[in-house]
Amino acid sequence: MSSGDPRSGRQDGAPRAAAALCGLYHEAGQQLQRLKDQLAARDALIASLRTRLAALEGHTAPSLVDALLDQVERFREQLRRQEEGASETQLRQEVERLTERLEEKEREMQQLMSQPQHEQEKEVVLLRRSVAEKEKARAASDVLCRSLADETHQLRRTLAATAHMCQHLAKCLDERQCAQGDAGEKSPAELEQTSSDASGQSVIKKLQEENRLLKQKVTHVEDLNAKWQRYDASRDEYVKGLHAQLKRRQVPLEPELMKKEISRLNRQLEEKISDCAEANQELTAMRMSRDTALERVQMLEQQILAYKDDFKSERADRERAHSRIQELEEKIMSLMYQVSQRQDSREPGPCRIHTGNKTAKYLEMDALEHVTPGGWRPESRSQQMEPSAEGGHVCTAQRGQGDLQCPHCLRCFSDEQGEAFLRHLSECCQ
């Protein structure tokens, strides 16, 4: 059992290192988020300070505020570069290396099981490889610590420059307030200016307080750097312990312990693979649902446009139909009025009767041209008589001099039945 203790310590060290790296990565992300929030609050304070100082109509304060804004923009750009820097990439690479190392250990375990006669030599080679990998991980962590230290120094320099600008701004405001106090009597406008200076000083104090808080945050980052250094020291101790175990290694591992360790690593690998597969399935389902929703939205938009166009065209058709009906009704009323005038002005006699029949015929033809839909026109008198003879209607031959006749069914109406004739005409011609 003493031979299994070094191997268990070596195998438990990799998860501990990965957990430590993940914890430090999350702490760095939270620290960056807090710094972003503080920068947003300070931007708001600077904007309010700029609006208040605009009322002073000075030349020094606006330029200082512009310089302060430039400093804040540079600070924000540095934070953005820090977010997009190499720290996150290095941490991800470290996690990937740990995963690859687990896979390599599994393959080496399988090789050891297949060749039991060289277990001791292969175990020594495996330990040497693990030591080399630890050295590589140490080098990567050193690079990461150096990058974090550089970023910390940059933040401290930026904070110092910002504090210097704030102090200079406060000094200028104090000088202006002293100059205004020595001017003698103060007008109402000067009193307002003094109050605005006091408010500007209060804002500057708030800004200084924010700078103090940012310095505290920088101190916290330095503490994180110290944690990294302690982690490096503990890792060095772990590597030294591995070297000592390698030197003291003389008895090969028992086959049962090796089998248990291989099975445990296989279970871990299967769990990781299943988690990755589930994540890929969820991502695929989300993408498919998003594409389906987008297609549905586009289809609904096209349907809405089509319905809108149909509604507009139908409304235009209805308006044209109503206008056409009104025009036809007006023409029919005018024709009826002309017919009534002609009937009132005619006199009895064979000659007058003949003229009246002819006039009624022309009026009837004119009414048919305006009322009958589909472009139907009576061509001749003989064509009008044919359907009446076939259908048994003989009212055309028996019409009086002022009678009205339907052009569709050849039904006759007297002069007093003008309204009935119009109703029949509208129903028969539909």
From Swiss-Prot:
Pfam families, alphabetized: EABR
Record note on modification: In vitro phosphorylated by CHUK. Ubiquitinated; undergoes 'Lys-48'-linked polyubiquitination probably leading to constitutive proteasomal degradation which can be impaired by IKK-A/CHUK or IKBKB probably involving deubiquitination. Deubiquitinated by USP35; leading to stabilization and inhibition of TNFalpha-induced NF-kappa-B activation.
GO cellular component: cytoplasm; cytosol; nucleoplasm
Gene3D superfamilies the UniProt entry points to: Nemo cc2-lz domain - 1d5 darpin complex
Residue spans, zinc finger CCHC NOA-type: 398-430
PROSITE patterns xrefs: ZF_CCHC_NOA (PS51801)
Keyword Coiled coil assigned: yes
GO biological process assignments: apoptotic process; CD40 signaling pathway; cellular response to lipopolysaccharide; inflammatory response; interleukin-1-mediated signaling pathway; negative regulation of canonical NF-kappaB signal transduction; negative regulation of endothelial cell apoptotic process; positive regulation of B cell activation
Region (Ubiquitin-binding domain (UBD)): 290-348
Subunit (UniProt): Interacts with STK11/LKB1, TNFAIP3, IKBKG, NFKB1, MAP3K8, TEK, RIPK1, CHUK, IKBKB and SMARCD1. Interacts with polyubiquitin.
Protein name (record): TNFAIP3-interacting protein 2
Organism for this UniProt entry: Mus musculus (Mouse)
Gene coding for it: Tnip2
